[in-house]
Amino acid sequence: MKVQMIERIFLIQLCLLTVVLASSRAVVEFESTGTKLVNSLRVLAAYSQSSVCVDEKISGIERQIEEVKDMYGNHSFILKGLNGILNNKVNMLTREIQMETVGNNTFETETGKLTKGLNRAVNISPFKYIKKFKTVSTKKFESLLNKYDLVAKKGGELTEEQKKKKEVLSRISRVVAATTIEAGLAQGVVDLCITVTTSLCLVSASIGGVGFLIWLTIIYQALT
């Protein structure tokens, strides 16, 4: 019994360490992408004929990138998602530069899009969307469970198959309701992934993930 307890404690510590390391890597990757993005903007600025202060605009983008990093630095899942979107933007700008399709107004257009997208990342909370989908899913599970309970209240008896379905639904419902997905997605399900089956853990993470993807789409639309 003591051996099992020690093993479980060790496993939990290992998982938490993995989360911390993943968070650190996510920050480093995000910083690297931010640097590439700023460098691309400086190249675009060379083509610009606008009288607007280039350095001021680029400094504004740098401040926004730093603000996003500080805000989501402890949420590697979120930072990785944003990093993917910004990295896509870097690749797009790189192609434009290589193909020499940069126009006189490209710098102003792209800095405007980036300002808008990063502003959304800061001012629109991803947790709002994650929590909304979690709440909707929890209510759906409760509704399904109530149907089985209604059969019992009417004096009926569930079949073996129905009993199994109810048990699975009940377990998933508990995981979804208890998991603090809105507090950090991957980080929030660490302990539950240790104590319940992997499939249930993935279900709970996926439910929050739907809301997260919608949030990323809102930012992506601003950047494009």
UniProtKB/Swiss-Prot annotation:
Residues 1-26 form the signal peptide. Involved in spore wall assembly. It is a multi-pass membrane protein. It comes from Saccharomyces cerevisiae (strain ATCC 204508 / S288c) (Baker's yeast). Induction: In respiratory-deficient cells and by heat. It is found in: Membrane. Its main location: membrane. GO terms for cellular component: fungal-type vacuole; membrane. Belongs to the OSW4/6 family. The lineage of its organism: Eukaryota, Fungi, Dikarya, Ascomycota, Saccharomycotina. Residues 27-174, 221-224 are extracellular. The chain crosses the membrane at residues 175-195, 200-220. GO terms for biological process: ascospore wall assembly. This is Outer spore wall protein 6. Residues 196-199 are cytoplasmic. Glycans are attached at residues 74, 104. Keywords: Glycoprotein, Membrane, Signal, Sporulation, Transmembrane, Transmembrane helix. The keyword Signal applies. Disruption phenotype: Displays increased levels of spontaneous RAD52 foci in proliferating diploid cells. A combined deletion of the LOH1/OSW4 and IRC18/OSW6 has reduced dityrosine incorporation in the outer spore wall.
